[in-house]
Amino acid sequence: MEMKDYIFTSESVSEGHPDKVADQVSDSILDAILAQDPRARVACETLVTTGMAVIAGEITTSAVVDYPKVVRETIREIGYNDSAMGFDWETCAVLVSIDKQSPDISQGVTEGEGMFKEQGAGDQGLMFGYACTETPELMPMSITYAHKLTQKLAEVRKNGVLDFLRPDSKSQVSVEYVDDKPVRVDTVVISSQHTPEVSYEAIKEGIIEEVVKKIIPAHLMDERTRMLINPTGRFVVGGPMGDCGLTGRKIIVDSYGGHGAHGGGAFSGKDPSKVDRSAAYMGRYVAKNLVAAGLCEKCEVQVAYAIGVAEPVSVMVDTAGTGKISSKRIAEIVREVFDLRPRAIIEQLDLLRPIYRKTAAYGHFGRELPEFTWERTDKVYMIRQKAGI
């Protein structure tokens, strides 16, 4: 028997978390390049540690970009503006080591080159998309609230409501399910970096009143809901001084918070010829449209590619038993409605734009911003027609 009553937990981290600082630096560099050269090939990795940021990778572009300036601007916007934090946009060292993309890879993803003349996938690999009916955004409830909590922490820090907060923070939300439906929030964990002089009581009260109660709806909390705020008691040393940060270390935060599967490829710092990013966005677009069309309540889509080959080697749909029609027929509809070749994905989702910095904190999915084209539900009518519902 499948487990129907359970508690499921997801976490999020704020824009000031060291791994997220690295993601945002990588995507800020990608955006700066795409703004000048939309066809650039970018694979940019970032490391941040006490007093230092390192960027390295393979970039082939005609764009002229002041990389250290982009790095510093990003760190400043996040809020590391004081060397007392161990990381400061003005004084940190910035090291740059950039090479060009390998010509062996380039010929596989450049139209008219390689064994297959069409633009092929930038690498082999498997990517997943997911959607469900738990929230209006068609995302799992636990990750939705976890992201909203870390966003709210950043907001009250920047607007001065809780001026003792510093940029590094994390949240975790545990949701109780009864008969496979989310019914209440069981536990909320928040850890936020803060100034040395503030009392624990002020931190706890401020975060509960100005963050938790403003985000988690009252009907989802009860007297049994636990709130664990800075449970170590002190969090002064944080950010890149507390932990070394690296691009691509928060792939579950970036996607579905542990719901569904993950192919293992990170998103940030990669231009859309890399299917790790573009096909994962397409997977979300497909899954969300299938759920929005009413074909299923939960949907996981897997696509897989071979390097240099345009057509996916496989497409799989799993509705966890919630499908109105067979998963086999849904997979056929996916191939009929959506073009899953890399160039077509880039065109359908308009991915050659400098839109990626926004994706690099608070989740790539479930945020209905105008730039997030993969969140549109504009294929619902066509899907319903083909499904005959």
UniProtKB/Swiss-Prot annotation:
One of its GO terms (biological process) is one-carbon metabolic process. It catalyses: L-methionine + ATP + H2O = S-adenosyl-L-methionine + phosphate + diphosphate. Its cofactor is Mg(2+); K(+). Its EC number is 2.5.1.6. Its main location: cytoplasm. Mg(2+) binds at residue 19. GO terms for molecular function: ATP binding; magnesium ion binding; methionine adenosyltransferase activity. Binds 2 divalent ions per subunit. Binds 1 potassium ion per subunit. It is found in: Cytoplasm. It comes from the Bacteria. ATP binds at residues 17, 168-170, 234-235, 243, 249-250, 266, 270. L-methionine binds at residues 58, 101, 243, 274. PROSITE patterns: ADOMET_SYNTHASE_1, ADOMET_SYNTHASE_2. Belongs to the AdoMet synthase family. Homotetramer; dimer of dimers. Catalyzes the formation of S-adenosylmethionine (AdoMet) from methionine and ATP. The overall synthetic reaction is composed of two sequential steps, AdoMet formation and the subsequent tripolyphosphate hydrolysis which occurs prior to release of AdoMet from the enzyme. This is S-adenosylmethionine synthase. It comes from Geobacter metallireducens (strain ATCC 53774 / DSM 7210 / GS-15). The lineage of its organism: Bacteria, Pseudomonadati, Thermodesulfobacteriota, Desulfuromonadia, Geobacterales.
